[in-house]
Amino acid sequence: MNTTSVDAYLQDGCGRCEHYQSPLCKVHRWVDELQVLRATLLMVGLDEGLKWGAPCFTIQGRNVAMLGAYRHDCVISFFEGAALVDDHEIMVPPGPNSRYARVVRFSSVDEIAQKLPHVRVLIVQAIEHARSGDRFVPDPVVDTWPPELDKRFATDEALSRAFHALTPGRQRSHILHIAGAKQASTRERRVTRCVPDILAGKGFNER
């Protein structure tokens, strides 16, 4: 695992697999994008280092955000992103059962440019949250069935069949995502966004 510096990470990779220091390392696919995100985080006075083989940004010793590189995208991950107000809904949980962290995914420099104003707002919030010393306490996990899902099933039998063919964990990931919105209109939009994954047999945010 690379534990030297963020510059070494961008040059050689994370060192967590056999592709370290080779063109096959996923980090090398996203160097330009990661550099833009890195500069954005440093611009607001965060301290930079490596944790778990990836760039980590802190304030007063508290973790604020990390950068990550994957096959299909790169991400900025907020450690307690669930505590932030995401008016533009650009954050997603990194996994179906994630209760604290939230990530923003990018697949190009242009996409970063489009989302950057909203990302900056999230970064400022994350810094303020870290400085406050507060610890985010997630709501108890309650699987509340969203009525908007039933409404869609009533008019789309194929979608209903596909959903009920999913594993319980994948079903739950969609339920939690949809039901997590407070407004009915937002829940309806989330149902629509989940349709392609449901039909493909995937859970929410599953790659």
Where are the regions a protein language model picked out?
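Charge-dense, helix-prone N-terminal extensions
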Residues: 1-207
